[in-house]
């Protein structure tokens, strides 16, 4: 949902705009990065799932395009730190434990995103972000960015008081004008109620929070065989 327009809009307001790069063809990624650069002079990065097909190629392409940072979650890759060090590109892993936070710092992470159980999408913990932040902030010396269920200014204030250096927000912008989501998906999202939020077992092998839909209903019953899935 976050392509050049949304990333640039966030960057223009002083944030770090992230392009969702998971599964994106490299030529499309180059286009989105260049488009974002034409729309802002702010900081632009990519967010990518380590579990996604073509992870290394996507990271290398983004680095070739001069991306400002790489944020990576849904798995953990030691190799990405080497790519970052070779090019001088900050690598920011998404973690959910003190142990992985310490490992990330040791491997050369520029910062870490700490994601709690409240997050949308793939989940790495059953612990609340408000429980994770104080412990992890004390355990490392690099910036700690809180993520998961951050919806308001008060949430930001609370998390910074707990030790976070900043926050990452995703779902809050899913239905924004700049979001790349289809209008029908935005309407579906806005009409959803709290009871419509479910946790499924994602096709990449991780639990994930989603808005209830026919596919989510099927996958909660059991594995759904892919039809024509490339590289499964």
Residue ranges and their predicted role:
Residues 1-143:
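Active-site entrance/lid segments in N-terminal catalytic domains of soluble metabolic enzymes
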Residues 6, 119, 126-145, 151-232:
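Conserved active-site-proximal phosphate/metal-binding subdomains
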């Amino acid at each position: 949902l976050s392509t050049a327009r949304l990333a640039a809009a966030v960057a223009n307001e002083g944030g770090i705009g992230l392009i969702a790069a998971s599964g994106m063809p490299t030529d499309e990624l180059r286009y989105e990065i260049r488009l974002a650069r034409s729309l802002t002079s702010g900081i632009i990065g990519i967010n990518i799932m380590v579990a996604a097909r073509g992870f290394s190629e996507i990271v290398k392409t983004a680095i070739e395009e001069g991306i400002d940072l790489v944020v990576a979650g849904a798995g953990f890759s030691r190799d990405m730190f080497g790519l970052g060090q070779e090019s001088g590109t900050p690598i920011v892993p998404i973690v959910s434990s003190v142990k992985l936070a310490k490992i990330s710092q040791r491997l050369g992470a520029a910062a870490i995103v700490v994601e709690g159980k409240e997050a949308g999408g793939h989940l790495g913990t059953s612990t609340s972000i408000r429980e994770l932040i104080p412990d992890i902030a004390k355990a490392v010396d690099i910036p700690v960015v809180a993520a998961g269920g951050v919806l308001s200014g008060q949430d930001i204030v609370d998390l910074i008081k707990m030790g976070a250096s900043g926050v990452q927000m995703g779902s809050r912008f899913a239905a924004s004008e700049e979001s790349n989501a289809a209008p029908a998906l935005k309407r579906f999202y806005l009409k959803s109620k709290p009871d419509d939020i479910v946790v499924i077992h994602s096709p990449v092998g991780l639990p994930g929070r989603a808005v209830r839909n026919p596919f989510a209903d099927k996958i909660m019953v059991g594995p759904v065989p892919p039809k024509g899935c490339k590289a499964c």
